[in-house]
Each structure stands twice: as C-alpha cells, then as structure tokens.
Amino acid sequence: IRFNLYAGVSKYAYRLLDYIVEEGKSDDYILLLNIVSENKIREWYPQFKTISIGSQALLKYPMIRTIYLSYDFRRKVNQSGCQAVFCPWGNEITCLKVKPFKISVIHDLQLRLDTKGLLLKIHQIIDDTVVKNSDKIVTISEFSRSQILSFYPNVESKVISLGNSVLMYPDERKRLFKDRYILYVGRICEMKNVMTLIKAYSLIHSQMSDCKLVVVGGRNNYWDNVIEPILKENNIQEKVNLVQNCSEADLTNYYRYADLFVFPSLREGFGSPPLEAAILKTPVLTSIKDSLGEVTRGLLYQLDDPCDEHEMASKMSEILTNPPSEEKLEKIKDELLLHYSIQNVGKRICDYIKNTMLKNSKGK
C-alpha cells in the first residue's frame, strides 16, 4: 500500500480498507506494508494484522531498494499462508509471480501513451510482467478495461472493471477562502491541461472581478516554467491562488464552497475530482476525454474541446452567471452516490475477491 494520501492509487486502497473496517471484516485480511509507510498506516488502521517488506538500510538507494522490495514481496507473500493476494496497484514491486492466487489492479495504462524512449520501455516491461503474473486483473472503469485490452488483447477473460469509489470527509463546514472562486484540483502538468484553464480564466477575470481561481496541487517545474509566465503576461498573479499540502478535510471544504469546479484534463483512467465536487453539490464543468465521459454519466456541464480557452471561458461565465438550481445539484449528488459510494464499490470488490478465491479453490 502506497503512503501518498493524494495519489489515486493510494485513495483506492484506503477507501477499500475503510469499507472493510466498516463491515467488521478486518480479521479476514493481512496488510502487506512497505517499511516507508508502515508506521503511519498501522496508526490509521490498527484493526489489521500486518507484514512489512523492505530494508531500512536500502532507503538511500532507490534502484536497489525497489529490486529488494520486489523479491521481498514475493518471499513474504509465499510465506504468509494466505489463499490469495490482492494488489491495489500492480507495479514494479508487486509484479513477480507468487504461489497464492493473485489479483492485481491496473488503474490505467496512460503512461504508455505519454512517455517515450527508455522510460516507455521500462513501463512496458513492468506492465507486461504484471499482466503475465496475475491470475485476475481488476480495473476502475470500462475505459481502462478497453485500454488494457488494446495492449493485451489475449487476456480479455481475466480483466474486469469494478469501478472506483468517492469518499468525502465528515461534514465539518469551514469556509477557507473569503472570495468567490473557481476551483481546480489535481496534478499540474500538460496532460491535466491546466494551461488552458489559466488562459480561459484570463479572458473572464475582468468581467468576474469578484471571482478568483484556486488551484489545489503541488508546485513543480511545469507551474514555474509554463503557468507562471501566463499569469504574469495577463497580470493575474494576484487572482490565481495555488494551494499546496491540502488536507482531505480542507479539500472537502474547498469543493463545498466553490462557485464552480473546472476539470479540463486530457488523460484520466477514472477521474475522481469532478465527482467529488459534484457530490458536494458544486457546479462542475468537465472535459469528457478518456474515461471522463463514462464516469460523469452525462450529468455535468461538458467541454466539447477542453483545449479551446474561448469555449471554456464562455461556459465558465455562463454557469457563474446562471448557476444550476439546488434541486438539480441534489439530484446529481444522489445519482453519483448510487454508483460511487464506498459501500457499493467496496462490497463489489470484496465480493469479487471472495468469489474468485472460492472458484479457484474448487478448481484445484
């Protein structure tokens, strides 16, 4: 289980654990933890028995550490006595063949589309090994399932989409930003298309002088080298606010009090942020690229061309001027919760693990 609280692969694992704890079934599972994250995860989930992998002595040597983690993973799993191993993220650490029945989650293969050269070859080798050494493969959307099969057409019988869940923290209302604001949450990079959002905002900021733009994400080279020059060119540095190291509780409140949430992403295997915003009854304008058309279920305002800043600006202005009714937002919330609640998705995943284990044991 990965420690990073904001990564989609981590959220997937934590929400599943939350469901297992809620159902009182923690005794049925053992957590296999990287030593880097074990103390914090044990603190969060004291209900589980745990096994740790890795070596403190190798923490300063990333390549050697990863190789050791991979072989230690296989060794500890084979010694565990478990009937099956469920890997919430199939990667270079969990890719080797093990004795128990193995179910790996492949969230998407977007990096196979967006990387080149040696890095692409490395991702291909890892993906090939995960697919080869997994008895079943779970993914998070029908889009991702189709993407996996486009690379691995011969594994159709062992790939299934079980969806993903959206979890918001308890209702502790606190307005964190005094002005009206448009919100974006996510990574800051080319494929998330933040540049177009900034350009679109620059077109309407003067007519929406009381409405700022809040970007929740980590500052990086892309922000410094691509976004900052656009802010300076359009003289909107004071109107665009970058929020880093945001807690889940604060993130919930950023969603809740936003006048509009905009998600212009070009690459998504699932796409939680627009769902998280909509479930808190915030108007959402979203791209429908990749999985987003599927997972948003046609319920949200859509961008025909997310790279067209003029279209985006026009639709942002229209929604801010004529926001949807409370009744409409409530209906959207209810519809999304039917499909993405932690209870429904958690049950689906746990039932699949249990039923697959039973079929495997009967087949032996």
Language-model features: locations:
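Carbohydrate transferase catalytic cores enriched for Leloir-type hexosyltransferases
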Residues: 1-364
